[in-house]
């Protein structure tokens, strides 16, 4: 008979299963934070705002997609879908502004 590996102390196997999305979310957050820290600041507040906000929104999109894929709350999944819709539009607006102000 084969048995699953024991869950870490304090976690049920079901919680471990659910945690997959959380692990991915933390990796996405760390990647985004690392990217923002490596970004070259121009000294132009408007340009820096646009670049940092775009990166911030891209992280939000990644997290929202993970919520939709792994989350269980209908309320949070609905919020994640709204975030994807709204912030995708805002990224396009930021891109358009940056294109006009190279």
Where are these regions (language model features)?
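His/Met- and acidic-residue-enriched segments that coordinate or traffic transition-metal cofactors
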Residues: 1-102
């Amino acid at each position: 008979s084969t048995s699953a590996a024991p869950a870490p102390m304090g976690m049920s196997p079901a919680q471990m299963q659910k945690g997959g999305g959380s692990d991915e979310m933390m990796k996405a957050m760390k990647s985004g934070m690392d990217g923002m820290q490596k970004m070259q600041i121009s000294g132009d507040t408007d340009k820096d705002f646009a670049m940092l906000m775009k990166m911030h929104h891209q992280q939000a999109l990644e997290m929202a997609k993970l919520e939709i894929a792994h989350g269980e709350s209908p309320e949070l999944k609905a919020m994640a879908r709204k975030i994807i819709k709204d912030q995708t539009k805002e990224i396009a607006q930021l891109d358009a502004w940056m294109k006009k102000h190279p």
